[in-house]
Amino acid sequence: MTDPATDTTRRNVHDHEVAKFDAAASRWWDPQGECKPLHDINPLRLDYVAQCLGGLEGRRILDVGCGGGLLAEGMARRGAEVTGIDMSKAALQVARLHALEMEVEVAYRQITVEELADSDEPRFDAVTCLEMLEHVPDPASAVHACARLVKPGGHVIFSTLNRNPKSYLFAILGAEYLLQLLPKGTHDWQQFIRPSELDRWAREADLVLRSMKGLTYNPLNQRYKLTDDTSVNYLAHYQHSPARAGS
């Protein structure tokens, strides 16, 4: 009998992507290791999420594609009630252990966002889905599932990479080959998502765009910052249409 926790044949999952994150799981919390870019951008991501939500204290938040728990733990430390989901069993094991060691409470589950949306899980105040959409075969499905998991008027925050020649130059050639910020093969440029594509899927799911910001990296000072340039990395804040409350 097939184990439902490992059967990905009919799920919105790339097995090879899960395998990559399984292999990197033990080094997830090493700020100087292959996950260094995530450590470097995490304060910016946390501040952006907090700003979009008007604070995290008391918010019930779902972190989709939580990996080893960098963002999930950060939100929990700021007072949010956080659930993190991922399909990498190894990454979740690391996330649980780190949260236990740091005495931070986060609920972690191995489940796809679509499966959670189909369950009787109570709706969340907000859903974060950062650096995840470019790693699944059907990102539109994930966007729709995220929208189904928030309360009427709830917030959904995405981050991903734009698909254009500049993003290939910076995110693939630059980040993976020249600067070696990420392991080679971390990203597939064909899986990158134009803001117009993300916005179309979001609008189909009754999500209204509230803000969009770019995330740029300066190799000279090795720092990231939020800008209005969305040509490579970008974050997008959506709110579920209040019309849903009456539906």
UniProtKB/Swiss-Prot annotation:
Task: Name the pathway.
Answer: Cofactor biosynthesis; ubiquinone biosynthesis
What InterPro entries does this protein map onto? SAM-dependent_MTases_sf (IPR029063), UbiG_MeTrfase (IPR010233)
Q: What is its EC number?
A: 2.1.1.222, 2.1.1.64
Q: Which GO terms describe its biological process?
A: methylation
Q: Which Pfam families match?
A: Methyltransf_23
Q: Which UniProt keywords apply?
A: Methyltransferase, S-adenosyl-L-methionine, Transferase, Ubiquinone biosynthesis
Which catalytic reaction applies to this protein? a 3-demethylubiquinol + S-adenosyl-L-methionine = a ubiquinol + S-adenosyl-L-homocysteine + H(+); a 3-(all-trans-polyprenyl)benzene-1,2-diol + S-adenosyl-L-methionine = a 2-methoxy-6-(all-trans-polyprenyl)phenol + S-adenosyl-L-homocysteine + H(+)
GO terms, molecular function? 2-polyprenyl-6-hydroxyphenol methylase activity; 3-demethylubiquinol 3-O-methyltransferase activity; polyprenyldihydroxybenzoate methyltransferase activity
Q: Which family does it belong to?
A: Belongs to the methyltransferase superfamily. UbiG/COQ3 family.
Q: What does this protein do?
A: O-methyltransferase that catalyzes the 2 O-methylation steps in the ubiquinone biosynthetic pathway.
Q: What's the protein here called?
A: Ubiquinone biosynthesis O-methyltransferase
Instruction: Say which species the protein is native to.
Output: Alkalilimnicola ehrlichii (strain ATCC BAA-1101 / DSM 17681 / MLHE-1)
From the broadest rank down, the organism's phylogenetic lineage runs:
Bacteria, Pseudomonadati, Pseudomonadota, Gammaproteobacteria, Chromatiales
Gene name in the database record? ubiG
